[in-house]
Amino acid sequence: MDLPGPIHDFLLVFLGSGLILGGLGVVLLPNPIYSAFSLGLVLVCTSLFYILSNSHFVAAAQLLIYVGAINVLIIFAVMFMNGSEYYKDFHLWTVGDGVTSMVCTSIFVSLITTIPDTSWYGIIWTTKSNQIVEQDLISNSQQIGIHLSTDFFLPFELISIILLVSLIGAITVARQ
């Protein structure tokens, strides 16, 4: 989106703070309904980021798939769960929470320090997308496919692994 600099910067800060607050709401709110609505806020802010970066197709796909389908499905599933079981024996902070937060913080710090210094193009299965075809000769959908299979191959695969683990966790919780 072609906006003047101060307006663009204000929108970036506003959407970034919406993402941070929504993410904290997803993790910290004890009521799963409120967490699901916070997840909806995060997904809407993400799609607005895509609109700011002139990726209208990806923004529309984000809204339709994640907000329109997956978040509604999560809210629907949470509505069927027994809400009173979340508040039984609710302790604000336990030893396991402290250990988990320390482990997550150390992993986060190590990733933040490692990822910017890593050259992902030295890995054998990634090539630069401009080596494949000229960018002017292909459509936006083809460019998205090329970027997913070249520049963003590793993050795309990591997201698929995270989704697989969350699906296995959901099946395990549903069986209990």
UniProtKB/Swiss-Prot annotation:
MF term (GO), any: quinone binding
EC number(s) per entry: 7.1.1.-
Gene Ontology CC terms, in alphabetical order: chloroplast thylakoid membrane
Transmembrane residue ranges: 10-30, 32-52, 61-81, 92-112, 152-172
Catalytic activity of the protein: a plastoquinone + NADH + (n+1) H(+)(in) = a plastoquinol + NAD(+) + n H(+)(out); a plastoquinone + NADPH + (n+1) H(+)(in) = a plastoquinol + NADP(+) + n H(+)(out)
Membrane topology type: Multi-pass membrane protein
Highest taxon of source: Eukaryota
Location(s) in or outside the cell: Plastid, Chloroplast thylakoid membrane
Top enzyme category: translocase
One Pfam family recorded for the sequence: Oxidored_q3
Main location (coarse class): plastid
Keywords: Chloroplast, Membrane, NAD, NADP, Plastid, Plastoquinone, Quinone, Thylakoid, Translocase, Transmembrane, Transmembrane helix, Transport
Subunit structure: NDH is composed of at least 16 different subunits, 5 of which are encoded in the nucleus.
Function: NDH shuttles electrons from NAD(P)H:plastoquinone, via FMN and iron-sulfur (Fe-S) centers, to quinones in the photosynthetic chain and possibly in a chloroplast respiratory chain. The immediate electron acceptor for the enzyme in this species is believed to be plastoquinone. Couples the redox reaction to proton translocation, and thus conserves the redox energy in a proton gradient.
Name by which UniProt lists this protein: NAD(P)H-quinone oxidoreductase subunit 6, chloroplastic
Species of origin: Daucus carota
